[in-house]
Curated annotation (Swiss-Prot):
Gene that specifies this protein: rpmF
SUPFAM superfamilies, sorted: Zn-binding ribosomal proteins
Region Disordered, residue ranges: 1-20
Keyword Ribonucleoprotein: yes
The protein's name: Large ribosomal subunit protein bL32
Protein family (similarity comment): Belongs to the bacterial ribosomal protein bL32 family.
InterPro entries: Ribosomal_bL32, Ribosomal_zn-bd
Transmembrane stretches, start-end: none
Top-level taxon in the UniProt lineage: Bacteria
Keywords from the named record: Ribonucleoprotein, Ribosomal protein
GO BP term, pick one: translation
Pfam family, one: Ribosomal_L32p
Molecular function in Gene Ontology: structural constituent of ribosome
Amino acid sequence: MAVPKRKQSRANTHARRSQWKAEVPTLVKTVENGKVTYSLPHRAKVVEDSAGTALFLEYKGRKVADV
């Protein structure tokens, strides 16, 4: 395992950590039953009835799995 030769300064530590940034997820806008919803691309979505009960999973307009 690598062992540092000497202690890293706070400035260098903060400069290194400043490169770690969270990315904003890209969302796809879809219209379901007159409502606009946003979801992650390339993911199966849950199709619900009017009462909110999950019916099945759908991907690209096709039924892919039962819930």
